Design a protein with these regions (language model features):
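Short, structured surface patches at the beginning of a domain
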Residues: 1-108
């Protein structure tokens, strides 16, 4: 499956969080036979409107350049339970899967 990785930090105290997430998700994708075709990285926490890479990802959904988006946790993709249904609907309409490879506590 062709996948994109979406990486976002949870707070300003990042350290190597972005690099770690990218390595972790790329490794998982490769181990499961997925081809990583794009990586979207939002380097600052913030509201969805400020997540420019997420907005770029959403704009590419209908282009079908990837079949799934791998994220560390649903709380990386959406800022709250209220935001998630709208995002999930966009992914579903485009036929793109949201893939969360690890059992996470997706506290928003």
């Amino acid at each position: 499956m062709r996948v994109a990785l979406y990486i976002r930090i949870a707070n300003d105290n990042t350290g190597d969080a972005i690099s770690y997430q990218a390595q972790e998700l790329r490794r998982w994708s490769n181990e499961h036979g997925h081809e990583v075709v794009e990586v979207f990285k939002d380097n600052a926490p913030g509201v969805l409107a400020e997540c420019f890479e997420l907005q770029r990802l959403l704009a590419q959904l209908d282009a079908h350049t990837f079949d799934g988006v791998v994220v560390r946790g649903l709380n990386r993709l959406a800022r709250s339970y209220y935001d998630f249904p709208q995002l999930a609907d966009k992914f579903q309409k485009a036929g793109v899967k949201i893939i969360v490879p690890y059992d996470t506590d997706d506290a928003f």
